[in-house]
Amino acid sequence: MTDIDVTVIGGGAAGLMAAVSAARCGARTRVIEHMDRIGKKILSTGNGKCNYTNAVQGLSCYRGENPAFVLPVFEQFGQEDTVRLFEELGIYPKIKNGYYYPASEQAVSVVEVFGMECDYLGVDLWTSCGLQSIQKTCTGYEIS
């Protein structure tokens, strides 16, 4: 089995962002996705257009007992960082009513670009792959 520095469980939006970020930092990275392809749920976001961020991200946009939980996250990686990352990947925005979409207005283009970036960075993409267990070992974790 190949030694991997980072294993990301799930090849959705968050998983792909995590994998790209880890690989850009030099980590040998693998994504394990149970669906037959990465980014499948991304295809339905924004009515198939992939609304990837919003101009307004105040606390009123979040529900739950503690909407302030998002503040430390946005301090580290906010809306401007998201737009910059997408532009670095070649995904330029089309803004409608404060919602950011790829200029193509096609969610599939976002999935394809993240797939190409993963390939470029050498990220192992395992699809149609069920996860049975994660065991802590003395040197890390064993995933089966």
Stretches with model-predicted labels:
Residues 18-19, 41, 136:
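Short glycine-/acidic-enriched loop or helix-start segments at secondary-structure transitions
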Residues 7, 23-47:
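Glycine-rich FAD pyrophosphate-binding loop
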Residues 11-12, 33-35, 46-47, 54-55, ...:
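Fold-independent oxyanion-binding glycine-rich loops
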Residues 47-97:
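Glycine-rich active-site loop/strand segments that organize a redox cofactor
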Residues 14, 18-23:
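Small-residue (primarily alanine) positions within well-ordered alpha-helices
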Residues 2-4, 25, 139:
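Residue-level preference for short coil/turn positions at secondary-structure junctions
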Residues 76-144:
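Feature captures the FAD/FMN-dependent oxidoreductase FAD-binding
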Residues 1-14, 30:
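Beta1/beta-strand and adjacent pyrophosphate-binding region of the FAD-binding site
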